Amino acid sequence: MNVAPEPGAAGAAAPQGRKLLRLEVRNAQTPIERKPPWIRTRARMGPEYTELKNLVRREGLHTVCEEAGCPNIFECWEDREATFLIGGDQCTRRCDFCQIDTGKPAPLDRDEPRRVAESVHTMGLRYATVTGVARDDLPDGGAWLYAETVRAIKELNPSTGVELLIPDFNGKADQLGEVFEARPEVLAHNVETVPRVFKRIRPAFTYQRSLDVLTAARQFGLVTKSNLILGMGETPEEVRTALVDLHDAGCDIITITQYLRPSPRHHPVERWVRPEEFVEFAQYAEGLGFAGVLAGPLVRSSYRAGRLYEQARSRNTSGASNSG
């Protein structure tokens, strides 16, 4: 239900002039939290980053890295890695941590896969991550768009690795199958949080269905990946249990990060997880047998994605040869 902002919600204006949702008004009663000293980055503008920055500006290209203000842009661009958002800037679902707005999406842009592929080519990327909004308004849930973007990138950039971060397509096997057939190097679907708080944080998704998406991708023969965001009300024991669930579901690669609140209308930060806790979670995940693990306050699901894929592929290959 939409409601008008209350006085405490000042500064939490909703996008595109819409009224704040009741949940957003409640969230806005909590001021934006002060970040702890370990949540900081230093700009290291090496030659690769500077070249890409100038090229992106000159060619009018669009990346999530810049438009979302990602703190890791300097490192990723130095490695010739970047992330692209497809499907528009309006999502048909609302997650309480996500900065992408919920609304009625624009009509499907069938030329978008070609433009993304050309951007990858122009930027000379070694590894490209493609993510997008949920498109429940489309008959196929956007499956063609996700699959075609992978196909277009691979056709124009045969040596570039592609990681595809997808919604759950409501668990529909035909839509998931169409996406899997495009065979990205990594198929990612982010669980994001633990079962107890899942419904509150991601009401349009279900925890088990997200696990099932990863299982289906793994059974198809794809390298799988997921992400957990900490600081939204979970306990350390629940994090460990979720890691077990993800590994049992067939997830190869896991990233673990700190929740950073995008605006006052988003879910308040309930806890700042200390760096040493991330080290402990990473060690626990490695002990479970994940092929690739990256955890830290400023890690994002696409952070060092190419390196993590190579690490996972190496471990999977090594494990297969040792078991033989």
Curated annotation (Swiss-Prot):
One of its GO terms (cellular component) is cytoplasm. Belongs to the radical SAM superfamily. Lipoyl synthase family. InterPro entries: Aldolase_TIM, Elp3/MiaA/NifB-like_rSAM, LIAS_N, Lipoyl_synth, rSAM. Its cofactor is [4Fe-4S] cluster. Binds 2 [4Fe-4S] clusters per subunit. One cluster is coordinated with 3 cysteines and an exchangeable S-adenosyl-L-methionine. PANTHER family: LIPOYL SYNTHASE, LIPOYL SYNTHASE, MITOCHONDRIAL. [4Fe-4S] cluster 1 binds at residues 65, 70, 76, 302. Residues 77-291 form the Radical SAM core domain. It catalyses: [[Fe-S] cluster scaffold protein carrying a second [4Fe-4S](2+) cluster] + N(6)-octanoyl-L-lysyl-[protein] + 2 oxidized [2Fe-2S]-[ferredoxin] + 2 S-adenosyl-L-methionine + 4 H(+) = [[Fe-S] cluster scaffold protein] + N(6)-[(R)-dihydrolipoyl]-L-lysyl-[protein] + 4 Fe(3+) + 2 hydrogen sulfide + 2 5'-deoxyadenosine + 2 L-methionine + 2 reduced [2Fe-2S]-[ferredoxin]. The lineage of its organism: Bacteria, Bacillati, Actinomycetota, Actinomycetes, Mycobacteriales. Pfam families: LIAS_N, Radical_SAM. It is found in: Cytoplasm. GO terms for molecular function: 4 iron, 4 sulfur cluster binding; lipoate synthase activity; metal ion binding. SUPFAM superfamilies: Radical SAM enzymes. Its EC number is 2.8.1.8. Pathway: Protein modification; protein lipoylation via endogenous pathway; protein N(6)-(lipoyl)lysine from octanoyl-[acyl-carrier-protein]: step 2/2. Its main location: cytoplasm. It is an enzyme of class 2 (transferase). Keywords: 4Fe-4S, Cytoplasm, Iron, Iron-sulfur, Metal-binding, S-adenosyl-L-methionine, Transferase. This is Lipoyl synthase. It comes from Mycobacterium marinum (strain ATCC BAA-535 / M). [4Fe-4S] cluster 2 binds at residues 91, 95, 98.
